[in-house]
Amino acid sequence: MATETPAGGPLEARISRAEPKTDASATSEPATGDTTETPAATKPSAADGQTDGASEGFGGSQLQEPEYSVNVKLSDLQADPNNPLYSIKSFEELGLHPSILQGLHSMSFRRPSKIQEKALPLLLNNPPANMIGQSQSGTGKTAAFVLNILSRLDLSPQMELAPQALVLAPSRELARQIVGVIQVMGSYVDKLKVATAVPMESNRNQKVEAPVVVGTPGTVMDLIRKRLFNPQHLKVIVLDEADNMLDQQGLGDQCIRVKGLLPKNIQVVLFSATFPDHVVRYANKFAPNANQITLKHEELTVEGIKQLYLDCDSDEHKFDILVKFYGLLTIGSSIIFVKTRASAVEIERRMVAEGHTVVSLTGGVEGQKRDEIIDKFRQGDAKVLITTNVLARGIDVQTVSMVINYDIPELHAPKATKRIADAQTYLHRIGRTGRFGRVGVAVSFVASKEEWQMLQDIKTYFNTEIQRVNTQDWDEVEEVVKTIIRSSRAGSNFQRS
């Protein structure tokens, strides 16, 4: 069985290539330019946006963050990164338009997170400078680049329909989520429209007429080639989950081709929780002379996520344990990550046969059906979602209290003599819980010595603790997990105002 995500190819050669050949996937996606406007009369709620790093119900940015150091490397080597100009303690210090501040406050943002403290002054500075930004999952990266976008829009009658900002995401689910954040944060910005450019079942051939466009690289490329999307007025391009976008075969090629069609002076913003060393080199070429905000990889794991592992006797025993886990999975919402599409389908079939309510979503599910599944999960109609790495990154469903690594994530390395852990994907997977200071549980199933060794490698890489729980004592398993989830629901890590 083939794994869900292909291995990344040598990107340096692709970036240096003057005229990359057309990748079939760039034109095989039917395109749409769906445009949604935020009328003043009906403001979307924070829940509608599934916002990254804020929710009225959870206290927004009043949550405490763990201690970690944010390293700033300025493109101007003569500048002092400790200068107060490069760090703010309140959104009001940024000189934002009142309509943008009003949107922030409606989302319960009260003060910037650490990534926002450092990133926003650099993003909003003029003349615009490129940025490569890294921070822990669930700390408000999306909000940071959305604020920058909203602050740079010209919504005068002459420009209100001209695309001025482009956000590229690796999946339709993340693209739709980002659209929701922009709509909520910009709900008080008059005349704001957001266009979505993601694969659909039918090609509507609509012209893109919105100042903000969010989409997947292949679809955006298709729209530009068909002259349905005029990029000449674009001021900023954002790559969310940038390391994945640049390093993955196909996606990286498409991002490079899209950028080649944009204005040369465009502001390039790259954000992700992870930037492996080999990707940083390529990112520096994609976003030259960028200000950089980075963390040590030992500081990337989120403190609020309790990491556990269970010894399983075999792959079949994994399923037996998963069935036992169902009662714990539905206390909040849970995501189960597996290696292949076939595994996701088979586990869903067997759990449904056991009488359990679950849904699965993989890259093999098309367009509208994918939207229906993720919306059902967001709304709580289904509390357990089985998926592959297609949803490992960026997806923010605030009710998720548990992540299960049914299969330990591993790198696709055909010539390797042993299985190699994918530490970056592990971090992104478990980051679907513990969002913005909340508590979550990440449980990994281990059924072989190789899987155990991969988990040990992940533990060493991040310098983190992954506690073993005895599957022979189910009372202990339930007590450990329930205690953590109860502490999350009670808001034990909230900082009350």
Curated annotation (Swiss-Prot):
It is found in: Cytoplasm; Nucleus, Nuclear pore complex; Nucleus membrane. It catalyses: ATP + H2O = ADP + phosphate + H(+). A motif (Q motif) lies at residues 89-117. InterPro entries: DEAD/DEAH_box_helicase_dom, Helicase_ATP-bd, Helicase_C-like, P-loop_NTPase, RNA-helicase_DEAD-box_CS, RNA_helicase_DEAD_Q_motif. GO terms for molecular function: ATP binding; ATP hydrolysis activity; RNA binding; RNA helicase activity. Residues 122-293 form the Helicase ATP-binding domain. It comes from the Eukaryota. Pfam families: DEAD, Helicase_C. Keywords: ATP-binding, Cytoplasm, Helicase, Hydrolase, Membrane, mRNA transport, Nuclear pore complex, Nucleotide-binding, Nucleus, Protein transport, RNA-binding, Translocation, Transport. It is a peripheral membrane protein. ATP-dependent RNA helicase associated with the nuclear pore complex and essential for mRNA export from the nucleus. May participate in a terminal step of mRNA export through the removal of proteins that accompany mRNA through the nucleopore complex. May also be involved in early transcription. This is ATP-dependent RNA helicase DBP5.
